[in-house]
């Protein structure tokens, strides 16, 4: 009976008499679903319409899905936690450019490297991305200042100019090498404790969970110069509460994004979402307050000339680059960004190395050739480890931390692939789809780090398009913490491969992805760490 009801509902939702031509399952063009803001005028004037050029087409001529079909795909077909897979399906059906309508909004999806390049190279001084309304709803609800991830325009530019200090340049990131190595040493101690507790004496039952603790400890140490106990056998309760709150916030974000606002008082997702954010900001504010009090104590004791500028937040506060409210609005977001990028990427990298013993052995040989066993790698060593860098690049290609991004070009009309889009069109950049495009990456679903090495051979054509994989973004709105994240992953992977042989636990099978804004493993990744002699 239930199966019959689902089948009946499916055909009801897809019946053109119910949903109109824009939702036809065969992909009839969704002109009716394009709002007025996207109805580009087909006049004889404007860009690209001179006598010597073909007429630019209207966005209304693009194929795509309407609201009901999109909701059907999300909640009845189960794509709500697998949006990148839905984008792969839509590209196969519609081609590299299609629309998705949701309520009064219509987005233009771009799923090829040349299309991404066309949009990203037209960014202005203040690139606009998705407004992240759900994050703004929480900030507005609590009276918080917008942080770097949701601020736009001049406010975003001010935050960006302040926060890029001591982060963006490789030699600035190198300043954090000793701090990261200190945390990684503690992580390896904790790793050995977890291994010893396992039945086999060498297994880690949940690699992502353990690496999450590493990443949180590392980013907190960099931002606040404070250790918060993530790598101890017993984690402090406020730290554990923060970790739980991040998971709760992300899990409920998926439903908050796609359910209408009138459902918020009726369903549990909104309350859980708010509580998650409240705890995240409470944790961040506590760390900020402690650093402010520490700085005040130094000022009272030594005066302004005696203050020793050390860590990242200390530097920003001492130089008065951010107000108190801007600091409170931004630093909890930086904590989140610093955790998910490295922990998930390292998990995927170790998973694939465990499945690729030949690549792992080549990497071990490279690392120990530069840094023998017993020595700790330094920033300068990675200039001599091209395979290590290639492993990280290939992992980020297969699993971009944020599989989908967006841009809204507000200053002008935009010409993309023969179409003319009006100002304020939102372009969805399908990074996951693009980075698995066989025309850019042959055998796109296989783990092949050697494709990133400079030497081009018959079996290694190299990278065929520079925008095929841009996991840290592009231009002035690219990832602020890229250099820190790369350094942390290089240090972590090199030290693990130097000391252990990594093997996949029996019965693991294939690990798929789940999208909860960021891309995470669908199940616990169990690995064996075998001590090298």
Curated annotation (Swiss-Prot):
GO terms for molecular function: cholestanetetraol 26-dehydrogenase activity; cholesterol 26-hydroxylase activity; cholesterol 7-alpha-monooxygenase activity; cholesterol monooxygenase (side-chain-cleaving) activity; heme binding; Hsp70 protein binding; iron ion binding; vitamin D3 25-hydroxylase activity. Its EC number is 1.14.15.15. It catalyses: 5beta-cholestane-3alpha,7alpha,12alpha-triol + 6 reduced [adrenodoxin] + 3 O2 + 5 H(+) = (25R)-3alpha,7alpha,12alpha-trihydroxy-5beta-cholestan-26-oate + 6 oxidized [adrenodoxin] + 4 H2O; cholestanol + 2 reduced [adrenodoxin] + O2 + 2 H(+) = (25R)-26-hydroxycholestanol + 2 oxidized [adrenodoxin] + H2O; (25R)-3beta-hydroxycholest-5-en-7-one-26-al + 2 reduced [adrenodoxin] + O2 + H(+) = (25R)-3beta-hydroxycholest-5-en-7-one-26-oate + 2 oxidized [adrenodoxin] + H2O; (25R)-3beta,26-dihydroxycholest-5-en-7-one + 2 reduced [adrenodoxin] + O2 + 2 H(+) = (25R)-3beta-hydroxycholest-5-en-7-one-26-al + 2 oxidized [adrenodoxin] + 2 H2O. Residues 386-400 are annotated as: Sterol-binding. It is a peripheral membrane protein. Acetylation of Lys-125 and Lys-285 is observed in liver mitochondria from fasted mice but not from fed mice. Residues 1-32 form a transit peptide. Pfam families: p450. Its main location: mitochondrion. Pathway: Hormone biosynthesis; cholecalciferol biosynthesis; Steroid metabolism; cholesterol degradation; Lipid metabolism; bile acid biosynthesis. Keywords: Acetylation, Cholesterol metabolism, Heme, Iron, Lipid biosynthesis, Lipid metabolism, Membrane, Metal-binding, Mitochondrion, Mitochondrion inner membrane, Monooxygenase, Oxidoreductase, Steroid biosynthesis, Steroid metabolism, Sterol metabolism, Transit peptide. It comes from the Eukaryota. It is found in: Mitochondrion inner membrane. GO terms for biological process: bile acid biosynthetic process; C21-steroid hormone biosynthetic process; calcitriol biosynthetic process from calciol; cholesterol catabolic process. InterPro entries: CYP11_CYP27_families (IPR050479), Cyt_P450 (IPR001128), Cyt_P450_CS (IPR017972), Cyt_P450_E_grp-I (IPR002401), Cyt_P450_sf (IPR036396). GO terms for cellular component: mitochondrial inner membrane; mitochondrion. Heme binds at residue 479. Expressed in the gray and white matter of cerebellum (at protein level). Residues 34-60 are annotated as: Disordered. Disruption phenotype: Mutant mice show cholestanol accumulation in the cerebellum. Its cofactor is heme. The modification N6-acetyllysine is found at residues 142, 232, 285, 296, 375, 512, 523. Interacts with HSP70; this interaction is required for initial targeting to mitochondria. Belongs to the cytochrome P450 family. Cytochrome P450 monooxygenase that catalyzes regio- and stereospecific hydroxylation of cholesterol and its derivatives. Hydroxylates (with R stereochemistry) the terminal methyl group of cholesterol side-chain in a three step reaction to yield at first a C26 alcohol, then a C26 aldehyde and finally a C26 acid. Regulates cholesterol homeostasis by catalyzing the conversion of excess cholesterol to bile acids via both the 'neutral' (classic) and the 'acid' (alternative) pathways. This is Sterol 26-hydroxylase, mitochondrial.
């Amino acid at each position: 009976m239930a199966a019959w009801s689902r089948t009946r509902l499916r055909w009801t939702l897809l019946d053109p008499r119910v949903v109109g031509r824009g939702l036809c399952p065969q992909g009839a063009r969704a002109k009716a679903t394009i709002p007025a803001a996207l109805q580009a005028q087909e006049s004889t004037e404007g860009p690209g319409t001179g006598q010597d050029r073909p007429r630019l087409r209207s966005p209304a001529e693009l194929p795509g899905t309407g609201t009901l079909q999109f909701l059907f795909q999300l909640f009845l077909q189960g794509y709500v936690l697998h949006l990148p897979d839905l984008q792969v399906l839509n590209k196969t059906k519609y081609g590299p450019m299609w629309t998705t309508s949701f309520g009064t909004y219509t987005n233009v999806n771009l799923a090829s490297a040349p299309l991404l390049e066309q949009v990203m190279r037209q960014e202005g001084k203040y690139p606009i991305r998705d407004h992240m309304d759900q994050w703004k709803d929480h900030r507005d609800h609590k009276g918080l200042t917008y942080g770097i991830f949701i601020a736009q325009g001049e406010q975003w530019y001010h935050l960006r100019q302040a926060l890029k200090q001591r982060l963006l340049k490789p030699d600035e990131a190198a300043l954090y090498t000793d701090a990261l190595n200190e945390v990684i040493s503690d992580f390896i101690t904790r790793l050995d404790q977890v291994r010893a507790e396992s039945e086999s004496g060498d297994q880690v039952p949940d690699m992502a969970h353990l690496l999450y603790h590493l990443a949180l400890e590392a980013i907190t140490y960099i931002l606040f110069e404070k250790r918060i106990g993530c790598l101890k056998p017993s984690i402090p309760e406020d730290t554990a509460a923060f970790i739980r709150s991040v998971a709760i916030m992300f899990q409920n974000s998926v439903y908050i994004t796609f359910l209408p606002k009138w459902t918020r008082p009726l369903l549990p997702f909104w309350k859980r979402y708010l509580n998650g954010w409240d705890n995240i900001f409470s944790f961040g504010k506590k760390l900020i307050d402690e650093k402010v009090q520490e700085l005040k104590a130094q000022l009272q004791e030594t005066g302004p000339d005696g203050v020793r500028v050390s860590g990242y937040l200390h530097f920003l506060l001492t130089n008065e680059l951010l107000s108190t409210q801007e600091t409170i609005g931004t630093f909890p977001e930086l904590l989140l960004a610093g955790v998910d990028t490295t922990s998930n990427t390292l998990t995927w990298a170790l998973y694939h190395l465990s499945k690729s013993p030949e690549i792992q052995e080549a990497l071990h040989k490279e690392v120990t050739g530069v840094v023998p066993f017993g020595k700790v790698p330094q920033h300068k060593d990675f200039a001599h480890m091209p395979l290590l860098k290639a492993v990280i690049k290939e992992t980020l290609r297969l699993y971009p931390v944020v599989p989908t991004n967006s841009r809204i070009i507000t200053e002008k009309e935009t010409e993309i692939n023969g179409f003319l889009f009006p100002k304020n069109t939102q372009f969805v950049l399908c990074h996951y789809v693009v980075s698995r495009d066989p025309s850019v990456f042959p055998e796109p679903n296989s783990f092949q780090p050697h494709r990133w090495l400079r030497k081009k051979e018959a079996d290694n054509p190299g990278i065929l398009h520079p925008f095929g994989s841009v996991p840290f973004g592009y231009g002035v709105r690219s990832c602020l913490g890229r250099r820190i994240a790369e350094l942390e992953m290089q240090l972590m992977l090199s030290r693990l491969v130097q000391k252990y042989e990594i093997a996949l636990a029996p019965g693991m099978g294939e690990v798929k992805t789940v999208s909860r804004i960021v891309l995470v493993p669908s199940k616990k990744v169990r690995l064996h760490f075998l001590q090298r002699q």
